[in-house]
Amino acid sequence: IEIGKKFKAEGIDELVLDLRYNGGGYVITENVLASMFAPQEAVSSKKVFEKEIYNSYLSESYQKQGESLETRFTTEFNYPEVEVNASTKDANIELKKIYGLIGSGSASASEALLGGLMPYTNVRLIGTQTHGKYCTGWMLSAEEMYEKCPQELKNWGIYVMVSIYQNADGKTPCMPDGLIPDIQIEDDPIQAYQIGDVNEPLLKQALMEAGRSYETNGVGSRSAASPHFKALPPVKTPLFGKRIQLIPSFVSSHSK
């Protein structure tokens, strides 16, 4: 949030967002970032950022409890159950364009952040196809489900998929097989530039899109100089992406 305030003070209106190795996280974090990046008008009027599509039973339960199925842009985030109390009031950058660096390691909440901003902001995707995890889950522990936790369940937990998310246009851009890049570029381990180096292939492409000039003869290509390097085969284990939503009180209280 402090960096957002700094960017706002400096008049930043385009951002390179590197989510290549981000497998997801909490919906709260996703909404904090989105509310910093989205147009000020969308945030001040609390427009819909994303909505959850549950089965009929959960949808009816939410409605009976008067709880919304929508996540809206906001500036105040108060969630004592996870010790979050933050404000983005002075950190709305109001980006005109986002260059999203993506790859197979981008999943779940990171895909949802980009997809949720697409109806409001120009999102340009650079890299390779993302993982394609379009579900939202609840992280359940025995302590949350029982008044008195049995000893054999002390270290027990389960991550349950409960919904599919959609953006304000009713779309899930990463469904079914991941976000498709506007510009397809593979990471090049042979060149081995540090993340953040302006010559690293994906960042270089984003900066050129933003107007940065590079010498036509290439800047320090390392491929020829390092013939002994060889890329490892891709990891075959499925990525465990996360998009975690806080469990509504009516669910945890009902189960106890």
Model-derived features: where do they sit?
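C-terminal "post-core" interaction segments
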Residues: 1-14, 19, 23-256
